C-alpha cells in the first residue's frame, strides 16, 4: 500500500473494547457483534466464542483478553474495520483489562438493566478514563422482566458522570440494539492517530506460545508499518528477530502482508525463548529504531503468595515448564523455586488474588496434567527486627523468632463494597469480623449503598468474597486497591504432628484470633488425618507455647481375642506387650498429611 491508501484505511479503523461487571453480558454482546458483521458462518458460531479456554466456558467468566478484526458496512455506505478487544470483568483480572484498554481508542460500557452499576463497572470505567477513551454506555438485558432502563440511565449519569441520553438500550441475548451499537462506534470512537511513515512502534499487549512457530506476540501498531522479513528489535530486552509472519484475528489467525498504524494483530518471528517478549514491551525496527518505547502499563505486583508442589516429585521440571508457559500468557504471575521438608521441591508463586490463584492451579492440572499440592495463601509482610534491620516475608515458614521481632506491618486495602440497603448490616458485620475500619458510606440511590472500609489484605485472601456473596444473596459487589502497610499484632502459628513441625501448615495470624484459629485447625486436622497405628498428638503453637491440642487415637488390634477364661495376668501381659510396641512405633513413625488437610487450612472459616 502507498501512503494515501494507508491514510485512507487508517481513517476507517475503529479500535474498541467492551467493559462490564461480571455477568452483565459482555461475552454475549461480543458474540452478537461477530454475528452482525458476518465474521463467522452460522456453523462456526458458538456461545461465548471469544472465551477460548475450556475453563472460561465452564465458569462462564472471561479470563484472557481476546482480539478480533471485523469488517462492517455502516449506514453511510462506507466499509469500516473494527477491532474488538474482549476483556475480563473480574477484579483479579484488572491487568488484562488495562492491557486491552491501552490498545483501544474507545470502550463500550455494558450495564445490566436490572442490576445497574456495580463495583467493577466503576473500576473499569476509571481505567478507561485514565486511558482517555471515548466511552459509549450500553444498557443491556432490557428484555428482562425486572429491567428498569430509565433508573439505570440516571445511575450512569449520577454515579459515573457520563452523558447517558444517547445510551443504547440493548439485549445481547435477543439481538436487540446491536446495529445501533455498531453505528455509535463508527460515529463516536476516534480513528487511530499515528503516522505510517514514522519509525515502527508496536505495543505487545499479550503473547502465547505455539510449539511450531515459537512465541506469538499480539500487537497494536501505533506508528510505522511492519512486514514479513523485517528485522525487528524488542526495546526492553534489546533482542532482535526476523519477522516470519504477521496477520490479524478474524477470530482465526489470518496472515497479511503488512500491519500498519491502528492495526491490531499478531506477529511471529521464531522467538524460541519465552523471556524475550515481555508484555507491555515495544517492538521497533532494528535498522531504524524509534527514539523511545511506548509508555507500557505498570507491572502489577502480586498480592497473594502460595507454594505449588507436584504430588509426584519427579515432575518438578515439568511444573517449571508449565509455569514458564503460563507466565508468557499471564504477565502477572511470578514464581521462584522453594523447598519444604514436608512437601519436597516446588515453587513459591505470586498471584493477583484468589480467583487468579485457582485459575492458574486448574490450568496447570488440565493443560499440563500435573497434580499439585498447594499451601495456604499468604501476603507480603514487612518485619522489623530489634537489631534495627528489616526483612520481607512472603512465606510464613521464613518468619524469624518472636523474640527478635520489634514489629510486623501488613498490607491494607481500601475496599469499596456496593450493596443493597437491606444488607448493609450484614456487610458491616463481615468487615468488622475481618478487622476492617469503617471509612465512609454513600447512598447511590434509594436502594443502594457504597461502603468503604480499610481491611488487611490477609483477611480478604481467605474467604472474604465467599462470605460477602453468601450473606448478601449474591447482590454485593466489591473492588479493592492497595493503600500501603500498617503495623499489626501478628504472630506465626506452627502446627506440630507427633511433636514434629509441618512447615507447609504454618500460617501468620492476628494475636487476638490466634487461640480460636488454632483450636479450629487442630480439630479439623483431627478429622482429616487418617488414624495411625500409634496415637498422634496435634498441637498448634506460637513460639514455644502450645495454644491448642487434640489427639488422634491409635488403631489397635484386639489382642485378647484368643484368650478364653479369666486369667487377668495373661491378658495384662498381652496388653503391655502391645503398648510397648505402640510406644516404639510412635518414636519412629511418621505421619502422612493428605492433600485435603492442606486445603482445609485454606478454606477455614473463622467462626
UniProtKB/Swiss-Prot annotation:
GO MF annotations in UniProt: GTP binding; GTPase activity; ribosome binding; translation elongation factor activity
EC top class named in words: hydrolase
GO cellular component: plasma membrane
PROSITE patterns: G_TR_1, G_TR_2
One Pfam family, short name: LepA_C
UniProt entry tagged with the keyword GTP-binding: yes
InterPro entries: EF-4 (IPR006297), EFG_III/V (IPR035647), EFG_V-like (IPR000640), EFTu-like_2 (IPR004161), G_TR_CS (IPR031157), LepA_C_sf (IPR038363), LepA_CTD (IPR013842), LepA_IV (IPR035654)
Catalysis: reaction(s): GTP + H2O = GDP + phosphate + H(+)
Domain tr-type G intervals: 11-193
Cellular compartments annotated: Cell membrane
Recorded topology in the membrane: Peripheral membrane protein
Binding site for GTP: 23-28, 140-143
Source superkingdom: Bacteria
Signal peptide bounds: none
Record keywords, A-Z: Cell membrane, GTP-binding, Hydrolase, Membrane, Nucleotide-binding, Protein biosynthesis
EC number: 3.6.5.n1
GO biological process, one term: positive regulation of translation
Role, per record: Required for accurate and efficient protein synthesis under certain stress conditions. May act as a fidelity factor of the translation reaction, by catalyzing a one-codon backward translocation of tRNAs on improperly translocated ribosomes. Back-translocation proceeds from a post-translocation (POST) complex to a pre-translocation (PRE) complex, thus giving elongation factor G a second chance to translocate the tRNAs correctly. Binds to ribosomes in a GTP-dependent manner.
Family the UniProt entry places it in: Belongs to the TRAFAC class translation factor GTPase superfamily. Classic translation factor GTPase family. LepA subfamily.
PANTHER family in UniProt: TRANSLATION FACTOR GUF1 HOMOLOG, CHLOROPLASTIC, TRANSLATION FACTOR GUF1-RELATED
Protein name (database record): Elongation factor 4
Taxonomic placement: Bacteria, Bacillati, Bacillota, Bacilli, Bacillales
